[in-house]
């Protein structure tokens, strides 16, 4: 039977991608249905209890700048906040927070249940309704059919998921949840390339059985960082420390002596695991010269006794897991409450997607999260928001939108996936972005909030706060530009006390702030320049914009040069065999990838600058050279 009301957008899966997709589509005014196999696990943290980190924190800030949910949720659920790379430049500084799993899930569910235009329904999906290469609905396990103009697949590790502990394995979407086997079979019938990946998680430890007195503590930062541009440290719950222990030679001997019982090393697991989050077995074998690895003992929540030992993800048998855990300092009497495991699952080649995350072959079908070959809550959330907003635009018969590489880490993520694809779980790093000085955490709102407002994602409150911040930055920069200190003035002595070399000529506030030894905080305590901004976000922007002005201008020039290639469009229907002068390899790759622009074509492995030149000349001769606005 069909459900009585049709929907504009259906989201399948309620993890980090699905919840952002549902919120985005609903915020844009589309009637949205979120289908999940269990309402109680909406926003569930399946692996580590943390949000953010290098590259990942940048994505969270971008999701927030576009009106998304993740940053707000972690501000309400974070039990330890830190700035990573705090001593380095602003481009690579990143926020990270430990999370209380229960509080995080509550924050997500509360937001979903209070979002207008969004209905949540508990049923697993077993089939898609596809008519004339266009998706028009979904079918649940009890045969109930829902119609929609667009469908977003955010199914995580559930597609034909198989859990491995030692040489034993069983079907599962994650520990305690069933897999999605009928939907996996249905998707394999569609003209989409599919492969297998694997990821893993460590055993969870009972905190009451750990001797924390012999372990080093790691505390959060003070003052506490905040994730959301709309957030406040007052929203954070009670803060707690993490603890640090290490593996040792005994640990490594246990692992080496039991590799024949590892499903990875015994050839039972075929899927490729995440390079940047390897299992402890992989770390011991790949870094054989190291006699220890640092392990962070992270609390899972304020009301839980479970500890997440970050760094010992494993699929070894349970008895070996016990030996590994008890070989480490402070853990000699530890008890495991949940075993570690590896999980294999289906993923679909993201090169079969448009930059909007819509399938090139099935109209109205969007993919986001681990189904696209990524790993991590943050990567999933960012894709979910993009897929959700584009599903909403598709439903409303509007053109899709995707950020550029110079505009957002989300742009880098999507371009990497759709252009290059991936053979292993893809994780975001700042090093993946060629314009990372422009793509900082601190300016995510300046880069994206205006765009989010145009798309219908940003509400009035966020828009007003954003404009206040812009005005504060502009006013303060004008004030510093127009306030001068003369070397002969009485106030010069006060200023010179903070400088490595005294003033030799008249200097403005901006001139002084450009000096490496002068911070904004110091500057506004000097009598000519007091008082400063109370808004810490705006003050940070003023300092960064002034200190890095030359570098930022140089990078902007590079972006403008590259933009010429990005704006040169390639016809979707072009058969590259028509282009004389291209090698067979280049023709095959271009026909396979079907890049949307010259810029995207230039990033495909094996496409040479010479091939790009030939293509540009041919397009011009054919009168097919088109540039986007």
UniProtKB/Swiss-Prot annotation:
Its main location: cytoplasm. Keywords: Cytoplasm, FAD, Flavoprotein, NAD, tRNA processing. One of its GO terms (molecular function) is flavin adenine dinucleotide binding. PROSITE patterns: GIDA_1 (PS01280), GIDA_2 (PS01281). It comes from the Bacteria. Its cofactor is FAD. GO terms for cellular component: cytosol. It holds the Pfam family GIDA. Belongs to the MnmG family. NAD-binding protein involved in the addition of a carboxymethylaminomethyl (cmnm) group at the wobble position (U34) of certain tRNAs, forming tRNA-cmnm(5)s(2)U34. This is tRNA uridine 5-carboxymethylaminomethyl modification enzyme MnmG.
């Amino acid at each position: 039977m069909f459900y009585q009301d049709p929907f504009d957008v259906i989201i399948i899966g309620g993890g980090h991608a699905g919840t952002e997709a549902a919120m985005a589509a609903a915020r844009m005014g589309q009637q949205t249905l979120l289908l999940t196999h269990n309402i109680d696990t909406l926003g569930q943290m399946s692996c580590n209890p943390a949000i953010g980190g290098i590259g990942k924190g940048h994505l969270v800030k971008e999701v927030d700048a576009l009106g998304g949910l993740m940053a707000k949720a972690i501000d309400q659920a974070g039990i330890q906040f830190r700035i990573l790379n705090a001593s380095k430049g602003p481009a690579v500084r990143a926020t990270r927070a430990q999370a209380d799993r229960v509080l995080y899930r509550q924050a997500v569910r509360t937001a979903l249940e209070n979002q207008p235009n969004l209905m949540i329904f508990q049923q697993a999906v077993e089939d898609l309704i596809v008519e004339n290469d266009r998706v028009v609905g979904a079918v649940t396990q009890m045969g109930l059919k829902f119609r929609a103009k667009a469908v977003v697949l955010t199914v995580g590790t559930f597609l034909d998921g198989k859990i491995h502990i030692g040489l034993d394995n069983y079907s599962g979407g994650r520990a305690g949840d069933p897999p999605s086997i009928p939907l996996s079979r249905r998707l394999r019938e569609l003209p989409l390339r599919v492969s297998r990946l694997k990821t893993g998680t460590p055993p969870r430890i009972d905190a009451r059985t750990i001797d924390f007195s012999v372990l080093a503590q790691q505390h959060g930062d003070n003052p506490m960082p905040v994730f959301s541009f709309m957030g406040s440290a007052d929203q954070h719950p009670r803060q707690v420390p993490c603890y640090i222990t290490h593996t040792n030679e005994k640990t490594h001997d246990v692992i080496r002596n039991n590799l024949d019982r590892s499903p990875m090393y015994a050839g039972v697991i075929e899927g490729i695991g995440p390079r940047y989050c390897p299992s402890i077995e992989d770390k011991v074998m790949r870094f054989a010269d190291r006699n220890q690895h640092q392990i962070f003992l992270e609390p899972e929540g304020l009301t839980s006794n479970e500890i997440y030992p970050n760094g010992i993800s494993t699929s070894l048998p349970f008895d070996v897991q016990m030996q590994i855990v008890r070989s480490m300092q402070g853990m000699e009497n530890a008890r495991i409450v949940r075993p570690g495991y590896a999980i294999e699952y289906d993923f679909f080649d993201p090169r079969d997607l448009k930059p909007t995350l819509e399938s090139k072959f099935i109209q109205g079908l969007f993919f986001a999260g681990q189904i696209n070959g990524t790993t991590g809550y943050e990567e999933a959330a960012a894709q979910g928001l993009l897929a959700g907003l584009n599903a909403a635009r598709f439903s409303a018969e509007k053109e899709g939108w995707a950020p550029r590489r110079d505009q957002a880490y989300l742009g880098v993520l999507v371009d990497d996936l759709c252009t290059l694809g991936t053979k292993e779980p893809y994780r975001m790093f700042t090093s993946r972005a060629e314009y990372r000085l422009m793509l900082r955490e601190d300016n995510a709102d300046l880069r994206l909030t205006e765009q989010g407002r145009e798309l219908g994602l940003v509400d009035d409150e966020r828009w007003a706060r954003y404009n206040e911040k812009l005005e504060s930055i502009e006013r303060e920069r004008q004030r510093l530009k127009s306030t001068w200190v003369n070397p002969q003035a009485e106030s010069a002595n006060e200023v010179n006390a903070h400088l490595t070399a005294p003033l030799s000529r008249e200097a403005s506030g901006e001139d002084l702030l450009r000096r490496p030894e002068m911070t904004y905080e110091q500057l506004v305590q000097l009598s000519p320049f007091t008082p400063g901004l109370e808004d810490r976000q705006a003050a940070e922007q003023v300092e960064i914009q002034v200190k890095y002005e030359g570098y930022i201008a140089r990078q902007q020039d590079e972006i403008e040069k590259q933009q010429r290639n990005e704006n040169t469009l390639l016809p979707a229907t072009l058969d590259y065999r028509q282009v004389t002068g291209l090698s067979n390899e280049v023709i095959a790759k271009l026909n396979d990838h079907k890049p949307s622009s010259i810029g995207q074509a230039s990033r495909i492995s094996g496409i040479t600058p010479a091939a790009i030149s030939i293509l540009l000349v041919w397009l011009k001769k054919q009168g097919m050279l088109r540039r986007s606005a």
